[in-house]
């Protein structure tokens, strides 16, 4: 067994900073660990909410972000400023928004228990009802998520609210949806 050692995390971030912006936006720190330790960069904007079966730990290293939450009754924002941390409970619908260029955050979550599904949900910007939910067995953020998003964006039927008939905009949120 190889000897274990620490490394300079700030230097690691600087070395991988080119990946922390669109279109990639994130980089796993450890590939073969029981924790998914991910560094995420801004800017990003998204319109989906994630239903994660495990807790997520957020530590905002550089710049600020907003975590949009839906608790089943109310939509609300939790700003996470540079230097702040936040622990998200399992199954709390959340939409991480990092509007600041060059912002960097650390997200830590456990690998999924056997058989535990993640879900991506989109809600109507007009009436707030669920428009579409896609469940998946998440093993790789990079490989597993893009097909889910592409399928939703490509289907007007999937993007049409069953309650009010409004068509979800897909990838682009309405102007002013994210404020710090």
Swiss-Prot record:
* GO molecular function annotations of the record: 3-hydroxyanthranilate 3,4-dioxygenase activity; ferrous iron binding
In its UniProt record, which GO terms are filed under biological process?
anthranilate metabolic process; L-tryptophan catabolic process; NAD biosynthetic process; quinolinate biosynthetic process
Swiss-Prot/TrEMBL cofactor(s): Fe(2+)
Q: Which UniProt keywords apply?
A: Dioxygenase, Iron, Metal-binding, Oxidoreductase, Pyridine nucleotide biosynthesis
Binding residues annotated for O2, in chain numbering? 46
Residue positions binding Fe cation 1: 50, 56, 94
How this chain assembles, per its entry, is:
Homodimer.
Q: What does the similarity note say?
A: Belongs to the 3-HAO family.
Q: What is the designated name of this protein?
A: 3-hydroxyanthranilate 3,4-dioxygenase
Q: Which organism is it from?
A: Jannaschia sp. (strain CCS1)
Q: In the record, what lineage is assigned to the organism producing the protein? A: Bacteria, Pseudomonadati, Pseudomonadota, Alphaproteobacteria, Rhodobacterales
């Amino acid at each position: 067994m190889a000897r274990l050692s620490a490394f300079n995390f700030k230097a690691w971030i600087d070395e991988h900073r080119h990946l922390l912006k669109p279109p990639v936006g994130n980089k796993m720190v450890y590939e073969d660990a029981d924790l998914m330790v991910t560094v995420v960069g801004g800017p990003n904007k998204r319109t989906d909410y994630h239903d994660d079966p495990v807790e997520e730990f957020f530590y905002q290293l550089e710049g600020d972000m907003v975590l949009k939450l839906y608790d089943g009754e109310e939509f609300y924002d939790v700003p996470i400023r540079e230097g702040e941390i936040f622990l998200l409970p399992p199954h709390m619908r959340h939409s991480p928004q990092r509007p600041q260029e060059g912002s960097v955050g650390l997200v830590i979550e456990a690998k999924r228990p056997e058989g535990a599904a993640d879900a991506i949900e989109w809600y109507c910007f007009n009436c707030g009802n669920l428009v579409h939910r896609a469940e998946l067995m998440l093993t790789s953020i990079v490989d597993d998520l893009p097909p889910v998003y592409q399928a939703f964006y490509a289907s007007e039927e999937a993007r049409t609210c069953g309650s009010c008939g409004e068509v979800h905009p897909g990838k682009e949120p309405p102007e002013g949806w994210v404020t710090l």
